[in-house]
Curated annotation (Swiss-Prot):
The name this protein goes by in its record: ATP-dependent helicase/nuclease subunit A
UniProt entry tagged with the keyword Nucleotide-binding: yes
HAMAP family reported for this sequence: AddA (MF_01451)
Family affiliation: Belongs to the helicase family. AddA subfamily.
PROSITE patterns: UVRD_HELICASE_ATP_BIND (PS51198), UVRD_HELICASE_CTER (PS51217)
Catalytic activity, reaction form: Couples ATP hydrolysis with the unwinding of duplex DNA by translocating in the 3'-5' direction; ATP + H2O = ADP + phosphate + H(+)
Any GO molecular function: ATP binding
NCBIfam families cross-referenced by the UniProt entry: addA_Gpos
Cofactor: Mg(2+)
InterPro entries: AddA, DNA_helicase_UvrD-like_C, DNA_helicase_UvrD/REP, P-loop_NTPase, PDDEXK-like_dom_sf, PDDEXK_AddAB-type, Restrct_endonuc-II-like, UvrD-like_ATP-bd
Organism field: Clostridium beijerinckii (strain ATCC 51743 / NCIMB 8052)
Domain UvrD-like helicase C-terminal: 517-815
Gene name of the record: addA
E.C. number: 3.1.-.-, 5.6.2.4
Pfam families with a match to the protein in the record: PDDEXK_1, UvrD-helicase, UvrD_C
Source species taxonomy: Bacteria, Bacillati, Bacillota, Clostridia, Eubacteriales
C-alpha cells in the first residue's frame, strides 16, 4: 500500500497465511491499516489472487464496514494508478460492491433472505423497529399473565408471591423480560434456560461440590485470603521493626496460620472451606503502654491492618459462608421448584413472542442471529451440533474469514464464525484482530474470554493456530505511553482486567514526535493528576447523591477551565503550549478542537461542565446521546399530539396553552381553572368558548374568549385531520399549520431545534412501517421509548472541524484520538448496583436466586447467588479497568486527570496502605477493594517517585519508591480554592455613597400631621407578629406539653454564645444521640442488617464517609438496631425491602394549621391566620394495603410507663398522619413509637 513502512510484526500479520491467526493489536498500533493491507495483498497476489467477494470481512458497526470498504476502494484505485491495465484490479474494483464486508447482523440477514424456505419464513418479512419489539413484548407478557391468573396455577401464584409487590406484578414481568433478553445473546437460549433450572436439581453434597458455583466461589475466596495473608505479613513486618510491639507478635502469627490453613482448604470442597473459615479466631491483643512503644504510628498501622482482616473474614462468614454446607444444599434444593417454574414462564413467553412476530411477519435483531444459526447448523446421530449443507457451502466458498474488533464478539457470533469457516478443519482460514484490553461492551454481552482463550493457547511462531502481537503505538508521545504502562502494570491482572499487563502487553513508542527546539514552545509534559479534597470548607454534608455529584463536576470543571485557558495562552515566561500538526509535521498552537473531556458517563456531568466552561468563554460542545425528549421543542410537540389524541389530559393541555402555539398567559390559565374546578381544562376552555358564542357570559375578556375559541377550533380541526393522515404526514402538517417549525428556528440554537423536530418526523415515518398504526399507538410508542431509556439523543449539528472543546463518554471516544485529553470524574464510585438484584444470571454460571421461604416470609442468598455475585464483580471491575485503559490511550500529547474525594487524608491512608503490601505491584486483592478509577491510579502513584507527595503529606511509613520512566504531576486542591470568590470580593470592597439634601424647603403643617400619623400608626393585629410563620412539629408538641409558657419566648430565636474557654466537651447530649440514631436509620442498608457484625460494618462505613462523628459512632449500639429489625415492625420492613417495595424514610413535609392551635390565648379573629407546620416523618410504608407510621424514640423511659409515653407523643403522630394523608391520599391505619431504650414497639392505634 504505497510507501508505508511496516514493522516486522505488522508485516507478519499482513503476510501470514494458511492458519487461524489472532492479531493482538495494542492501542494506536495501526490494526485497521494492517487489516486493509492484508486484504489488498490477498486480492492482488500475483501467484494466487483471490476475488474480494470470496472474503468474509466482519466488522463491529455499519460505519466501520463503510469505512473499510472505502479504504479498500482507495487502495485499489491507487494500485490502478500504478498499473492501469491490470484486469485483476479492475475486476476487484467491480466486485467490491458485492463484497461481504459487513456486520454480523447484515451477514445473517443475507443468509436468511437466501434460505428463508428452509425455516418456513415468509420472504416478505421485514426487520422490526426496536421499540416496536418493546410494544409487542408488552402485549404478549400482559396476555400471558392474564392467562396464567385464569388457570390458577399454584406454581405461578407462588412466583407472583415471591417476586411481585403487594401493588402489582411488574417485578415478575420485568424479570421474565430481562431473563429473555439476556438468554437471547447466547446461541441456544432454550437449552441454556433448561440447563440453568436443572442445575438446582441436586441430591447430594458431593454433586454441589462439583458445580461451577463452588469452583468460582473457591477461586474468589482464594484471592481474598491471599490478600489477608499479605496484610498480616505486612503487620508482622512492621511489628518486628518497631520496639515495644513484641506482645502483638504471637496473635499475628497465630492468625496468619489460621488464614493460611483456610487458603489451602479452598480446593478441598465446601466442608473443608467452611470449617477452616469458621475456625479462624482473633484473640484480644495484649495491651501495651504508650511509653513502651517507639512509634505510635506503626502501632496504629498494625491495629488497622488487623481490624481490616477481621472485618474481611467476618464478611465472608456473614455472606458466602453464613450457613453450613448442608444448609447451602437445602437452600439450592428449595429454590428448584420456583426456578423451574420461572424458566417455564420465560420459555412460554419466548414461544408466544416468536409466534406474534411471525403473525406480523417481522424479525428483530436477535432473530437474525438465531435464525441464521438454525440455517447453518444441523445435528449428528449423537445430537451434536454440526455444520449444515448451507454452512458447508460457505466453508468451501470463503477463502478467508476476517473478523475485526474480535474482542467484542459474543457466543452467538463465535458459533456462526465457526460454522461458516474452516477454523476447526485441516486448512484453517480465520483471521481475528483486536485488543482485549479495549473490550468494553460486556453490557452488550461481549465475551472477551473468547479472545483471551485463544491468546493463551495460540502459538507465537508456527502451527495451525498462531498469534502475533502489534505492540508499537503510533499515536502517543512517550509521556503518555510510559504513564499508561506504569499504571496498568501495577493494577491490571488476570483477576481484574482478565489479562496480565506484562512487558509483552506494554505499549512501545512508535510515533515520531520531532524534538522541540524553540524556547517559547511547550510540548507534551507529565501526566497531571488533580485531586480535589472536599473535606476542607465543608459546612454541610450533602445528602442528595445526585446534587453531590453535580457539585463535584462544578469543582472539577473549574480546574479544567483553568488549565484550558493556561494551555491556550502564553505563560508568564512567554511560552505557549503547542501540538504537532499532522499535515505539516510542524508544531502549532493548540486549538479548542484539539481538546476532549472524557467522562465515564455524561449524565449529571455534561451540563454542569458546559456551564462552567462557557462561563469562562471557552467554546464547548457535549455529545450527550440523551436529552432529546427533554428538549422544549420535542416536549411541546408531544404534548400537542397527546391533546389531539385525547384533550381530557390537563398537563399536556396546559403545556400547549403556555407554548407559543397558543400563547395563553399564566393569569388566563388561572381564570380558566376557576371556571369549574372539578372540570378538565379542556371542558373549561370549551365552556368559555361556547358562552362567548352565545353572548351569555360577559365576565371574560374578549382576548381570552378569542383564544379559547381558537384553541377549540384548532384541536377539532387537528383531530379530524389525524384520522385519515399518516402519522409522519400529520406531524409535518402540525409543524407547518402552527408555524412552530419556523418559530423554533428563530430561537437560540435554532438549527439544532429544527433538526430535533426533523428526527421526530423521521421516527414517525419509521413507525408507519411497523405493525402499529394511529396516533394513540405512536404516543404509546414514544412513551415506551422514553421508559426503556431509549432516548434518541439530540440531533448532531456540529461539524467535524468546528473549533470547540468536545465533551463525550469514554465509550464514544473508542477508536478516536485527541492531542489533549482531560479525563474527569475519576473519584466517582463504580456502579455495582446490578449485584443487588433479587436474582442474578450469568452465561457460564446460570441463575443466582435467593432462597425464599414463602411461609416464613424469609429469604437468604444461595450459594449460586454468592458465586455469581463474586464472578460478576470481578467481571465488572475488569471491564472498568479496560474502560480506563481506553480513556488513557486516546491522548496523543497531553493527559490531564481530575478526581474528587470526600476526605483526602483518609483516601491517602487507604492508597498508601494498599501500595505498601507488595513492592512489585498492587496486589489484586487490593485492586478489588478500589471503588473508583482514582483509587487505582493513586494506589499506583504511591509507589512512584513523582507520587512521593502523597506519602510525604499523608504517609504513615517510608515507602520504597520506584524509579520509573513515567512522569507525573500530582496536585491537591481544597474545595475552598475553587469556590467563586467574586461576590465576596464585591462585598468586601463595598461602595461609598455621599448623602445629600434633595430639598430643604420648610414643610407645611398638613404634611407634618400626615408624617406624624404614619409614624404613630399602630398595627391592629400585633399579636400575630409574635408568632413565626413557620413552626416545627417538635416545638408544637413541646408547646402542648407545657402548661405555663411564654409564646414570644417559645418562637423567638435563641442564640447562646459560649466563650471557647468555657466550652467543655462532656460527650453527646441526649438530643445529639437521638439525631445520630435517626440518621443511621435513614441511611442503613436493609439488605445488610441480619447480624450485629453487618450493622457494625455499616456504621463504620458511615464514619469513614464522614456521615458520623467518632463520638456518635461510640454511642450507637448496633445490638439495639438489630433488635428493631427483629421486631414485628422491622420484619415488615425487611419483607417489603425483599420485594422491592418502597419504604419512606425521613420524609420532610409542610402543611398549614390555624394559629389558634399554636397559641390559644389569641383572639378568635386570628382563627383564619395560617401558620406553616413543618416536620420530618421518620418512617412510613404500605403493608398489605395499610399505611403504617413509625416514629423512632431514644428517650429514657421506665418500664411500665408506656401509656404516659404514648400520650406525650400522640399529638405529634397525629400531625404526621395528617401529612401522610395529604401526601398519599391514604389514611394511616397504624401508628407506632419505637423505643430504642426499651427495644420495643409501642402502638398508639
Amino acid at each position: 500500500m504505497g510507501n508505508t513502512k511496516w514493522t516486522d510484526e505488522q508485516l507478519s500479520a499482513i503476510e501470514t497465511r494458511n492458519c487461524n491467526l489472532l492479531v493482538a493489536a495494542a492501542a494506536g498500533s495501526g490494526k485497521t491499516a494492517v487489516l486493509v493491507e492484508r486484504i489488498i495483498r490477498i486480492i492482488t497476489n500475483e501467484e494466487n489472487p483471490v476475488d474480494i467477494d470470496k472474503l468474509l470481512v466482519v466488522t463491529f458497526t455499519n460505519a466501520a464496514a463503510a469505512e473499510m470498504r472505502e479504504r479498500i476502494a482507495d487502495a485499489i484505485s491507487k494500485e490502478l494508478e500504478n498499473n492501469p491495465r491490470s484486469k485483476n484490479l479492475q475486476r476487484q474494483l467491480t466486485l467490491l460492491n458485492r463484497a461481504n464486508i459487513t456486520t454480523m447482523h447484515s451477514f445473517c440477514l443475507d443468509v436468511i433472505k437466501n434460505n428463508y424456505h428452509r425455516i418456513d419464513l415468509d420472504p416478505s418479512f421485514r426487520i422490526g423497529d426496536q421499540t416496536e419489539g418493546i410494544l409487542i413484548k408488552s402485549e404478549v407478557i400482559e396476555e400471558l399473565f392474564e392467562d396464567k391468573y385464569e388457570e390458577e396455577d399454584i406454581g405461578f401464584t407462588n412466583l407472583v408471591e415471591i417476586f411481585s409487590s403487594y401493588k402489582n406484578d411488574n417485578n415478575l414481568k420485568n424479570l421474565v423480560l430481562d431473563l429473555y433478553n439476556f438468554t437471547m445473546s447466547g446461541p441456544w437460549p432454550e437449552k441454556w434456560l433448561i440447563n440453568s433450572a436443572e442445575a438446582f436439581n441436586i441430591k447430594q453434597l458431593d454433586e454441589l461440590d462439583r458445580t461451577n458455583w463452588v469452583r468460582v466461589l473457591a477461586q474468589s475466596v482464594k484471592i481474598e485470603l491471599d490478600g489477608y495473608v499479605k496484610m498480616l505479613e505486612k503487620a508482622i513486618e512492621v511489628t518486628s521493626k518497631t520496639d515495644g510491639l513484641e506482645p502483638y507478635m504471637d496473635n499475628l502469627l497465630m492468625e496468619l496460620s489460621y488464614i493460611k490453613k483456610a487458603y489451602e482448604s479452598t480446593d478441598n470442597g465446601l466442608e473443608a472451606m467452611f470449617n477452616s473459615l469458621s475456625s479462624v479466631q482473633f484473640s484480644r491483643l495484649k495491651s501495651i503502654k504508650k511509653d513502651k512503644v517507639s512509634d505510635e504510628l506503626s502501632q496504629n498501622t498494625v491495629k488497622k491492618i488487623r481490624d481490616d482482616v477481621k472485618k474481611g473474614i467476618s464478611e465472608l462468614l456473614n455472606n458466602a459462608y453464613s450457613v453450613n454446607p448442608q444448609q447451602m444444599l437445602r437452600n439450592i434444593q428449595g429454590s428448584y421448584p420456583y426456578i423451574k417454574k420461572l424458566i417455564e414462564l420465560v420459555l412460554e413467553f419466548s414461544a408466544r413472542f416468536s409466534k406474534r412476530k411471525r403473525e406480523r411477519n417481522i424479525l428483530d435483531f436477535n432473530d437474525l442471529e438465531h435464525l441464521c444459526l438454525k440455517i447453518l447448523s444441523d445435528y449428528d446421530d449423537e445430537n451434536n451440533i454440526i455444520p449444515s449443507s448451507i454452512a458447508m457451502n460457505f466453508k468451501e466458498y470463503f477463502d478467508e474469514v476476517l473478523v475485526d474488533e474480535y474482542q467484542d464478539s459474543n457466543n452467538v457470533q463465535e458459533t456462526i464464525i465457526n460454522l461458516v469457516s474452516r477454523k476447526n478443519d485441516d486448512n484453517p482460514n480465520v483471521f481475528m484482530v483486536g485488543d482485549v484490553k479495549q473490550s468494553i461492551y460486556r453490557f452488550r454481552q461481549a465475551k472477551p474470554e473468547l479472545f483471551i482463550e485463544k491468546y493463551n493457547t495460540y502459538d507465537s511462531s508456527n502451527g495451525v493456530n498462531r498469534k502475533i502481537q502489534l505492540y508499537k503505538n503510533f499515536r502517543s508521545r512517550r509521556e503518555i505511553i510510559d504513564g499508561v504502562n506504569y499504571i496498568f502494570k501495577e493494577v491490571m491482572s488476570e483477576v481484574v482486567g482478565e489479562l496480565e499487563y506484562t512487558d509483552e502487553e506494554a505499549l512501545n513508542l512508535g510515533a515520531d514526535f520531532k524534538e522541540n527546539k524553540f524556547k517559547d514552545t511547550i510540548v507534551g509534559g507529565p501526566i497531571e493528576v488533580n485531586i480535589i479534597d472536599k473535606s476542607h470548607n465543608e459546612t454541610v454534608v450533602e445528602d442528595n447523591e445526585e446534587q453531590e455529584e453535580i457539585n463535584n463536576v462544578i469543582l472539577e470543571g473549574r480546574i479544567v477551565a483553568k488549565r484550558i485557558k493556561e494551555l491556550m495562552s502564553k505563560s508568564e515566561d512567554e511560552q505557549i503550549f503547542k501540538v504537532l500538526d499532522k499535515e505539516s509535521g510542524e508544531y502549532r498552537p493548540l486549538k479548542y478542537r484539539d481538546i476532549v473531556i472524557l467522562l465515564r458517563a455524561t449524565k449529571n456531568w455534561s451540563e454542569p461542565l458546559l456551564d462552567e466552561l462557557s462561563a469562562e468563554g471557552i467554546p464547548v460542545y457535549a455529545d450527550t446521546g440523551s436529552g432529546y425528549f427533554e428538549s422544549i421543542e420535542i416536549r411541546t410537540i408531544i404534548s400537542l399530539l397527546k391533546v389531539v389524541d385525547n384533550p381530557m389530559q390537563d398537563i399536556p393541555v396546559i403545556s400547549v396553552m403556555r407554548s407559543p402555539i397558543m400563547g395563553f398567559s399564566a393569569e388566563e390559565i388561572s381564570d380558566i381553572r376557576l371556571v369549574k374546578k372539578d372540570n378538565y381544562f379542556y371542558e373549561n376552555i370549551k365552556y368559555i368558548s361556547e358562552e362567548a358564542y352565545n353572548s351569555i357570559n360577559e365576565s371574560y375578556s374578549d382576548v381570552l374568549i378569542a383564544k379559547c375559541k381558537y384553541f377549540i377550533n384548532s384541536v377539532d380541526k387537528w383531530r379530524n385531520k389525524s384520522i385519515y393522515m399518516a402519522i409522519d404526514e400529520f406531524i409535518w402538517y402540525l409543524y407547518m399549520d402552527t408555524a412552530y417549525y419556523g418559530y423554533v428556528g428563530a430561537m437560540p440554537n435554532g438549527v439544532l431545534r429544527q433538526a430535533n423536530l426533523k428526527i421526530l418526523f423521521q421516527r414517525a415515518r419509521q413507525f408507519e412501517k411497523t405493525s402499529f398504526k394511529g396516533l394513540f399507538n405512536f404516543i404509546n410508542f414514544i412513551n415506551k421509548l422514553i421508559k426503556s431509556s431509549g432516548d434518541m439523543g439530540s440531533a448532531q449539528v456540529l461539524g467535524e472541524n468546528e473549533d470547540v472543546v468536545r465533551i463525550m463518554s469514554i465509550h464514544k471516544s473508542k477508536g478516536l484520538e485527541f492531542p489533549v485529553v482531560f479525563l474527569c470524574g475519576l473519584g466517582k464510585n463504580f456502579n455495582l448496583m446490578d449485584l443487588n438484584k433479587s436474582i442474578l444470571y450469568h452465561d457460564e454460571l446460570g441463575l443466582g436466586p435467593d432462597f425464599i421461604d414463602i411461609g416464613k416470609r424469609f429469604s437468604i442468598g444461595t450459594l449460586a447467588k454468592e458465586s455469581i455475585k463474586k464472578k460478576m464483580k470481578f467481571e465488572t471491575l475488569s471491564e472498568e479497568m479496560r474502560i480506563l485503559y481506553v480513556a488513557c490511550t486516546r491522548a496523543k500529547e497531553k493527559l490531564i486527570m481530575t478526581g474528587t474525594v470526600g476526605n483526602l487524608e483518609k483516601s491517602a491512608e487507604k492508597w498508601l496502605g494498599s501500595a505498601s503490601l507488595d513492592y512489585n505491584r498492587i496486589s489484586p486483592s487490593e485492586v478489588l477493594k478500589g471503588k473508583s478509577y482514582l483509587d487505582w491510579i493513586c494506589m499506583s502513584l504511591c509507589q512512584h517517585r513523582d507520587g512521593s507527595v502523597l506519602s510525604e503529606s499523608f504517609g504513615t511509613e517510608n515507602l520504597i519508591l520506584k524509579d520509573d520512566n513515567s512522569r507525573w504531576k500530582v496536585s491537591f486542591w481544597n474545595k475552598g480554592d475553587l469556590i467563586d470568590k467574586t461576590k465576596t470580593e464585591v462585598l468586601e470592597q463595598g461602595e461609598g455613597y455621599e448623602l445629600t439634601i434633595i430639598n430643604n424647603k420648610p414643610y407645611d403643617n398638613y404634611l407634618y400631621e400626615e408624617v406624624d400619623k404614619i409614624l404613630s400608626y399602630k398595627y391592629p393585629f400585633k399579636a400575630s407578629t409574635t408568632i413565626k410563620s413557620n413552626i416545627s412539629v417538635s416545638d408544637l408538641k413541646r408547646r402542648h406539653a407545657e402548661e405555663d409558657y411564654d409564646t414570644e419566648q417559645l418562637y423567638r430565636e435563641k442564640v447562646k454564645v459560649v466563650p471557647k474557654f468555657l466550652q467543655e466537651k462532656k460527650g453527646l447530649t441526649p438530643s445529639e444521640k437521638g439525631t445520630a440514631v435517626h440518621f443511621v436509620m435513614k441511611k442503613i442498608d436493609f439488605n445488610r442488617v441480619s447480624s450485629t457484625e453487618e450493622i457494625k460494618e455499616q456504621l463504620h462505613e458511615l464514619f469513614e464517609k464522614e456521615f458520623l462523628l467518632s463520638e456518635e459512632l461510640k454511642v450507637i449500639n448496633p445490638t439495639k438496631i438489630l433488635s428493631f429489625f427483629r421486631s414485628d415492625l422491622g420484619k415488615k420492613i425487611l419483607d417489603l425491602n425483599c420485594r422491592g417495595e418502597k419504604i419512606y424514610r425521613e420524609i420532610p413535609f409542610y402543611t398549614e394549621i390555624s394559629s389558634l392551635e399554636v397559641d390559644k390565648t389569641l383572639d378568635n379573629i386570628y382563627k383564619d391566620e395560617k401558620i406553616r407546620l413543618q416536620g420530618i416523618i421518620d418512617c412510613f410504608f404500605e403493608y398489605k394495603g395499610d399505611i403504617i407510621l413509625i416514629d423512632y424514640k431514644t428517650d429514657y423511659i421506665m418500664e411500665g410507663h408506656e401509656d404516659e409515653f404514648k400520650e406525650k407523643y400522640r399529638k405529634q403522630l397525629d400531625y404526621y398522619s395528617d401529612a401522610i394523608f395529604k401526601l398519599t391520599g391514604k389514611k394511616v391505619k397504624y401508628k407506632y413509637l419505637y423505643s430504642f431504650y426499651l427495644e420495643k414497639e409501642i402502638k398508639i392505634i
